[in-house]
Regions:
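Radical SAM enzyme [4Fe-4S]-AdoMet core and its adjacent flexible, acidic
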Residues: 1-64, 103
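Flexible mid-to-C-terminal extensions adjoining Fe-S/redox cofactors in radical SAM and related proteins
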Residues: 57-120
Length: 120
């Protein structure tokens, strides 16, 4: 009753979990399913216009607008920032969405306004 929408992420392959990483083809298939769910009215908080960037991992990282507190340590974006090369494999949808938003991507801006006004 209190959940208004869900948000999805891909696995970010930390050194001890690389085998869980998805291929580009698997990411595309996941995004197709999520997009279909959205089309059918499922309450999904992700931005469809960010999917191509997520599939190809071609969005700016790290997200300087996001901070994470974990085990008493404050990190820009998340603890993955401390692992060399991991940002380039980021699976966090919010990172793509926010970095593209703050870079002025018009599609992202429009869709974020529409989505956030719908669920917040």
């Amino acid at each position: 009753k209190n959940v208004r929408a869900v948000s999805f992420n891909f696995h970010t392959p930390y050194p001890d979990t690389r085998e869980l990483a998805l291929s580009k083809e698997e990411k595309a298939a996941c995004c197709d399913v999520i997009a279909q769910m959205m089309k059918e009215g499922a309450p999904v908080f992700n931005l469809k216009s960010a999917f191509p960037y997520l599939i190809e991992n071609r969005f700016p990282t790290p997200c300087h607008q996001c901070v994470v507190m974990e085990n008493g340590k404050l990190s820009t974006c998340g603890r993955c920032i401390d692992v060399p090369g991991l940002c380039e494999q980021c699976g966090y949808f919010f990172v793509a969405e926010y970095t593209l938003l703050f870079r002025g991507n018009p599609k992202i801006i429009f869709e974020m306004l529409r989505t956030y006004l719908k669920y917040i």
